[in-house]
């Protein structure tokens, strides 16, 4: 992971110290090379790389698929409940360092069940770490994601296996999502499984409009009936869609450094986040797969502020959006926004 140097501008320092929420993080994508090697040794898993440096050197992605290939290889070291605990606690430490006070975390059960690891094992390890995080002042939710390159039948089977867990962990496991290879796998492919999730009262999110066209965002909204759109940066190509997103306040969980690393944009100065913000869309800033993409939440904020020349009011709005778009109770949302306001406007609103 590359480290972003905190510049000495007042806005950068204010942003780093601000309480914030993360709404787009794949827990398997927080698995740093050092922990991959430690878990491989603990579990007797043979890796294709002979050193941590060799693994880092393989992080030269050209697109989403080339990243996913190595992402799934890295996840192969996760076998036992303790492995999922250790991975999640490492992410929690990063959150605490970045003043992330609330996180809504994705996990990919099919990545593990196809290796014989039950979903219950995955969730038990993650939940134990998140319960420990609560004792340190960080709240969280968990969202089960279906892999879109697999069939809807596979997603339906995964949903049924997970069904008891939605009850057992109803305080934490509050929704479903859709991720993995976007091209050729439109949201419409998963209409039935999202309808089942909706019938249980679960929250719904989906990756759309990262590499896929704006039509995928329409499908996520109209067919899957999502509460939030993950990525969504290609919505800018359709003015009517941008207006709809702005009017409905359906948030986009944008991941700037991920978009740069996966060549969605060839330069961060060309990112659409500010254009969307200017048009009233509820954009947020997130890390996606931080171990692979070179930065956790603060690194994403700092790079985006620098590249897009964001001002104080714009950064405040983005951070506030992260709380507004979260799946917390209205009471907790008000408390989180009050903490942000106390930090951002210490003398009260100006």
From Swiss-Prot:
Which annotated residues bind substrate? Answer: 289
| Record's signal peptide | none
Q: How is the cofactor bound?
A: Binds 1 zinc ion per subunit.
Indicate the annotated site residue(s) for Important for catalytic activity.
231
Q: Which reaction is this enzyme known to catalyze?
A: adenine + H2O + H(+) = hypoxanthine + NH4(+)
Name what cofactor the protein needs: Zn(2+)
The EC number(s) attached to this protein equal 3.5.4.2
Name this polypeptide is given: Adenine deaminase
- Recorded source organism is Paraburkholderia xenovorans (strain LB400)
Query: Source taxonomy lineage?
Result: Bacteria, Pseudomonadati, Pseudomonadota, Betaproteobacteria, Burkholderiales
């Amino acid at each position: 992971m590359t480290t972003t140097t905190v510049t000495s501008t007042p806005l950068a320092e204010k942003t780093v110290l601000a309480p914030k929420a993360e709404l787009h993080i794949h827990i398997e994508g927080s698995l740093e090379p050092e922990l991959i090697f430690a878990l491989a040794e603990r579990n007797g898993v043979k890796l294709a790389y002979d050193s941590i440096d060799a693994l880092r050197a393989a992080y030269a992605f050209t697109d989403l698929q080339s990243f996913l290939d190595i992402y799934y290889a890295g996840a192969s070291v996760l076998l036992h409940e303790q492995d999922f605990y250790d991975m999640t606690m490492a992410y929690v430490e990063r959150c605490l360092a970045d003043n992330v006070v609330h996180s809504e975390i994705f996990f990919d059960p099919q990545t593990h069940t196809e290796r014989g690891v039950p979903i219950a094992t995955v969730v038990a390890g993650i939940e134990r770490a998140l319960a420990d995080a609560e004792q340190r002042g960080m709240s969280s939710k968990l969202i089960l994601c279906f892999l879109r390159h697999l069939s809807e039948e596979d997603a339906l089977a995964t949903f049924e296996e997970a069904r008891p867990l939605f009850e057992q962990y109803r305080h934490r496991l509050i929704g479903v999502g859709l991720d993995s290879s976007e091209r050729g796998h439109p949201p419409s492919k998963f209409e039935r499984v999202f309808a089942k999730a909706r019938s249980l009262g679960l929250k719904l999110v989906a990756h759309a409009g990262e590499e896929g066209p704006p039509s995928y965002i329409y499908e996520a909204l109209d067919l899957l009936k999502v509460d939030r759109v993950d990525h969504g940066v290609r919505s800018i190509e359709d003015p009517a869609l941008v207006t709809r997103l702005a009017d409905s306040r359906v948030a986009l969980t944008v991941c700037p450094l991920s978009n740069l690393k996966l060549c969605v944009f060839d330069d961060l100065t060309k990112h659409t986040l500010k254009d969307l913000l200017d048009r009233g869309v509820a954009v947020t800033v997130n890390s996606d797969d931080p171990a692979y993409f070179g930065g956790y939440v603060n690194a994403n904020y700092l790079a985006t502020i620098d590249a897009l020349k964001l001002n104080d009011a714009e950064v405040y709005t983005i951070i506030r959006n992260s709380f507004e778009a979260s799946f917390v109770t209205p009471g907790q949302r008000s408390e989180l926004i009050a903490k942000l306001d106390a930090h951002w406007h210490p003398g009260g609103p100006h």
